[in-house]
Amino acid sequence: LIISGMKKATYFSYLLFLPFFLLTIDQNQAFANSVIEEKPAKIIYALAAPFTTITDNISLRDFSDFWSGTSAVQSETIHGKLLIVTSDPERFKTLFGEGDKNQIEFVTDIHAALSQSINNGNWLIVPFDQLDARFKVISIDEQNPLHKDFNDNLWPLTIRINGNENMTEQDWAAVQPLNRDPSKLTTMILTGVTALVRGTAAYMDVWGPEYPASNIGDTLREADILHINNEVPFAKVCQQTESELARLVFCSKTSALEMLKSIGTDVVELDGDHFQDYGDDAVYYTLKLYKDANIPYYGGGANIKEAQKPLIVEDHGNKFAFIGCNGKEIGYAVASDTRPGAAHCDIPLIVSQIKELKASGILPIVTFQHIELYKIYPNEDMAADFKAVADAGAVIVSGSQSHIPMAFDISKDSFIHYGLGNLFFDQAFFLPETSEATLDRHIFYNGKHISTEILTIKFTNNALNRFMTESERTAVLNRIFAESHIELDQDEQ
């Protein structure tokens, strides 16, 4: 960068933001142009905490009081010193005041800050695009830069540079942030078990096919990419007998497809145990229904080649590849060269697919129909498969099979969730844990997985669920997080 002839004030402004400039290589040209030409610019910072933090929101008043040292918020929410990653503390002091040195600390080394946060639980203020999946973003007064309705002009951690005293709020509103471009932001919701059968189907027969999603449908529809793991085939004639149900042989009525369409399903996983329950004809019929509805599928297909083929999806400039397989002993609805069904897990093949996709700039998303365990942390076989594909480069590794919410293992480059629980299935009263589940809303920005929001749901009957109350959510997250792990990166050790 040539700086000769640069005005002194502009030069020092550039130096103050140099660490940010170096960290965000993909946006450095836009930033440099704004600084050198003294154009008004905005940089979005996020309030973040380790992923296993329970708190979701803090009021601006409590945040400001903590900053100034006039509040005991720390003992309830903010843990330890608040670490602000910046080389220009004065801009934050202009917003919030000098600050209590016992409460806040300005740091320039982002790796050291991330390490301290993971090891000690400190909260952070970091540039939005420097987030990674080991950290959750804390809302301030219910505003959150991960959300589609985010308004940077109402966000207290929006840093304005190169403005002048004549600029109005309307002028600033027209300035687009340098490090948060909505055209590069993708939200993806991954879900657990869907099986529109038995008790769930009975409610749908009475109240209509869209009934199970009555309380959560709007949230599902809002996702740019909604994943559904539908374990059961559709049948032209689906009239289940008591004998079939006793043997756990399932089918869904064709009308049930309307529910999947109504919630905006974008991709369907077909590696479930029950995919061949009604024979080859039902599988072919199911595949045709999805094709006619323009809902792409993966993990199952008309033959083994189709079942094993990664599904490529692109949204807001981010490219993804969905790969799915059944990790139980061979025989569960398995496809072959001549028969339709689910892909049995071939881990060496998946590892090679992941590496090839990653080299092409595509983000691999691997979902498993694996062993169904009614405990929080997986057994050795399950953990080995999940970690093998994570080590190969899978960005997300998600367990679609579990009937209860399970633990997480998260590194800088890979997010593992061993099981989410039921999305639509009639186990509300089987065990207390089977009435609980998560929806994992993953956020990607400019080709990078930057954060995940865990939405928690609870069943009220065998078909209908709702979002949890705060106390219900806290209890579930505490239980899951107690057996979850966050790893340091090599640069942070």
Where are these regions (language model features)?
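Bacterial N-terminal signal peptides
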Residues: Y14-L23
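Acidic, metal/ion-coordinating pockets
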Residues: A173-Q493
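Exported/periplasmic ABC-transporter solute-binding proteins
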Residues: E38-N179
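Generic N-terminal amphipathic/basic segments
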Residues: I2-I3, A32-I44
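Bacterial N-terminal signal peptides that target proteins for export
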Residues: S4-Y14
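Sec-dependent signal peptide cleavage junction
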Residues: L23-V35
